[in-house]
Amino acid sequence: MKKVLTNIKLRAAFILGCIILSLSIQAQNTVIKAGHLFDSRTGKFLDDQILIIKQGRILQTGSNLKYEKNDIVIDLANSWVLPGLMDCHVHITSNYPYRKISALSDIYTTESSGFRALRGAYNAELLLKSGFTTIKDIGNDANYATADVIKAIREGWIKGPTIFYSGKIIAPYGGQTGGINPENEGLWKFEYLDADTDDEIIKAIRKNIYFGANTIKIVQGDQQYFYTEQNIRTAANEAHRAGVKLTCHVFEGEAARNVILGGADAIEHGLFLEDSLLQMMKDRGMFLVGTDLAYNNIYAYGGDSAGAKQMSDRIIDRLKRAYKIGTKMAFGTDVIIDLPGKNRVESNLEILKNWKAAGIPSSYVLQTMTVYAAELLGIDKNRGVLEKNYVADIIALKNNPVENIDAIKKVHFVMKDGEVIKNE
């Protein structure tokens, strides 16, 4: 009997010890000692700061903060520490042939949604480990392949960023295709939803949301026909009723004016926007996600070198004008072709060449990747700055990105939702 009682006591002591240990571990906070901490609201670095993180959120920030002996301490005293970066225009499941963009529609018949999802999972993890903790994927992902990537991240099967996702791209008849013969009519529906009336636009938005979209994208102006101001207003109202943002692919002119007056939240590309339209966007607090592709990115589509150079120069000019006017901007890349010898992130960051060529201050570029991007995405109360109660999405660099924006190409530390993903 005594032996039985002894065993019971030992087991009880063991269980109690496990509970105490578990509570002790749960009580542990993570402390980051930051040599230089980026204040994304001001665009300046603060020296010798401490962040205390609890259960995925920032508990405190400041200098000379006290913390517990058993807290986990991460020493980034020799690093430049920033909020996790955001890219507001990606296509993680797409990779079209280098200099063969005419083969775009061939992808519809050669790559399954499953294959595209696998590519998306690979690129999602790559983006996260490169410091991009939030992305907006806006289509060209076959039959909702990105939705499966999001599910895989949610299930914990893979690591990836927070993903905003548009579903299939909504467009007037034909999507963004051209030259498809009548026998193959509708081939584009692999990636697009035809919507030519207000009722069809509403139905397309609802379909996308049903299948996992949490933002809506409309293509405007890629055909001779395009949406009216009223069509855009219908789309904006329906999206906003569902609690999501509306963004529109458009380049210039009347098509862009309809987007602005119709109440969309952002313009994607806007490569040739006139000053008057940029001013209208500023007056309405509307965002431009400029996708300011550099020469190498444009040349990858095909065509000659002179044409790529001319296009890049026009993009730089629009970037200069938008910055001077004060149009709100959020960072977005739009790469769908990996450059030779470069992965997706390296190909994406080629566009920094155009930001530098336009004379945009590095501090502002960083703000478009953090606090301004968060505002566009509607998450500025939770992400985009490193302050009390904000989600602990944090990265660190070896060099000062305000002095040279290329420093963001070498991220050595990544924390996502308080979890250390990378620490080199």
Located regions from the model:
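Histidine-rich, glycine-flanked metal-binding segment
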Residues: L37, T42-L82
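Active-site core of metal-dependent hydrolases
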Residues: Y173, I218-D317, V335-K342, G359, ...
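Metal-associated gating/positioning segment near the N- to mid-region
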Residues: W80-K151, E155-W157, Q230, V259-G262
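His/Asp/Glu-enriched, well-ordered alpha-helical/loop segment
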Residues: S105-D106, R314-N400
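C-terminal cap of metal-dependent C-N hydrolases
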Residues: G35, M369, E375, K388-E424
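Bacterial Sec-dependent N-terminal signal peptides
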Residues: M1-N29
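Divalent metal-dependent hydrolysis catalytic cores, especially in the metallo-beta-lactamase
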Residues: R119-T146, G160-K168, I209-Q224, K245, ...
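Active-site gating loops and adjacent loop-to-helix segments of metal-dependent hydrolytic enzymes
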Residues: T93-F115, Y173-F190, D283-S312, G326, ...
